[in-house]
Amino acid sequence: MNKKVSKTLLSTVLIGLVLSQQAVEACSAFIIGKGLTKDGSFLYGRTEDYPYPHEDGTQEHTHNKNFFVNPAKDYKEGDILLDKSTGTVYPHLKHEYKYTVVADDSRDSNEGIFSEHGFNEHGVSMTATVTATPRSEVVGGKAPKVAADGRVLEGPENEVEYPAIDPLVKAGVTEAIVTDLILPRVKTAKEAAQLLAKEIDEKGSAEGNIIVFADKNELWYMEIYSGHEYVAFKYPDDKYSVFPNTYFLGKVNINDKENIIASKGIIETAKKAGVFVGDESKGEIDLAATYAPPLERGDRSRVYAGIKLLNPSSNVTFQDKRYEFLQDSPRRDFTVIDGLNVQRNRFETLNGELVPDDQVPGYDTKTDAYRKQADPSDPNYGKYAYAQETKM
């Protein structure tokens, strides 16, 4: 299918890199640690690919985005930030920082703002979100049985109804509001993760999500598993990751307060749901084994293709039961172009293992794709690449 690429050049503290773009189908993201890049910067990015539904049953396949600059502002007591998608209100701080976002052009509708990514004046950037489906054993609902060999058993006779241990909270934090809630209030990536953790502790989460925060020194990766359970992880310099719409973070020790921010019930909730994998006595939990549902083929194909693209010598296969979140690479010269290559990959690099997804019938979605760099050499310098793809 032919597509037209709409390219936007952005400046201020941002440098826009205008790049032609084809993106993989569905929401996917990547991180490349600063120890693996040519210029010593963190690289991360995400593609958003979602056919927005309308009330009349039709779908919008070319969903426009707008770039907004929100100036620093002083607020008086009683001023609020409203999440129109839920009706939840968040009191403004007395002073909030300048920040920029790329948001849906329908941001004034009752669906919410949906500022998908942005920077603030302190050099903190974020992307929100890679949507992930919580495990039914935890949040409640139906889920298929899984055979001993890992196969998901199909058919209604193989569905199990689970009670809710920690259900999602309808009025909790959403993708629609999270960027506008976090960016104007923080000075570092860790502060961003801590603030979101605090909001989830107090209000809960309405969705399963994955969010990335970065500043000039650090990058934090956060997974939200249920109404109140989450883990944020300080990303190492010498690894890379590719993650579509499910949870991939593996073994962590929640007692490692320097590198881990974990909800208080992260182990106890999993135990109550009967899904805990780890060693509670040591504070260890395998998060993917505990909180991730069975790996869908669409997620498997994207993570496999991304890993092999960035490291062709990797020994992962399409049949692997799971994929490690932190991947190794012999390269130390990755650039923003490598991030672009991940995003425009359609499996054509897999030597026929998978059909290129633009050849699959029914492929008809819009994509917002962007890459960000956190440059450690300059606290006020953010590099930003953005391309929006629309149907011809």
Identify the meaning behind each predicted range.
Residues 2-10:
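Bacterial N-terminal signal peptides that target proteins for export
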Residues 11-20:
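Bacterial N-terminal signal peptides
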Residues 20-26:
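Sec/Tat signal peptide C-region and signal peptidase I cleavage site
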Residues 27-174, 195-349, 354-360:
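A contiguous strand-loop segment
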Residues 176-181:
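Glycine- and acidic
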Residues 185-190:
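Short, charged, surface-exposed loops that flank catalytic or proteolytic processing sites
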Residues 337-392:
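Long, well-ordered mid-to-C-terminal structural blocks that present hydrophobic/aromatic surfaces
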